[in-house]
Amino acid sequence: IRMVCMILTYWLIALIPAIVMIVNKDKLTDYGFSKEKIGMQIIVGILIGTVMSVLLTLIPHLIGFGEFVDSGKRYKYLWQFIYEFFYCIFAIGLVEEFVFRGFIFEKIKRVAGKDIIAVIISSVFFGVFHFFSGNLVQMVMTACIGAFFCICRLKIKNCSTLSLLIGHGVYDALITVFASALL
């Protein structure tokens, strides 16, 4: 029950954007989701998350900087890792990508008329959102990761908000996997 409550609680973050979407009669496609080539979108997401994890988590662990990219979680049972992937994709990835790379990015892009402005503002919001879970350095790094996700969606073929929520979830989950295995 606690695990389900954690996911449902995280979904509350997306409540206001979801209400605005419903009131405006917007569709998920208005926020970067697509019905086309869903299999490719999933593969792109897995690749983005895996590459990010290798570059930003595994390599730092292997060269002695693991404590700087540590989630603080230590799992030893398979069910814990399975839940971590599920939670990171269907709570964190889904909510944060819908809100920041879907809703906020698209609303700013419509108002400003330029991708770059939407990338910068949505990424700054993403960084600020993460301020309370870390420090100023983490906030800046998270904003950079947000900008990277925006650029992926804009520049990579078959990269949608679905791809990003999967990539984000895989990246976050692999932080715990690598920390549990290597620290």
Regions found by a protein language model. Name each.
Residues 7, 42-47, 82, 116-121, ...:
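Hydrophobic alpha-helical transmembrane segments
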Residues 1-4, 26-92, 110:
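Juxtamembrane helix-loop-helix connectors linking adjacent transmembrane helices
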Residues 72-128:
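Function-critical hydrophobic alpha-helical transmembrane segments in multi-pass membrane proteins
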Residues 7-16, 82-86, 140-148:
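Membrane-embedded alpha-helical segments of multi-pass membrane proteins
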Residues 37-39, 78-81, 111-117, 135-136, ...:
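Membrane-helix interface segments
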Residues 1-25:
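Alpha-helical transmembrane segments in multi-pass membrane proteins
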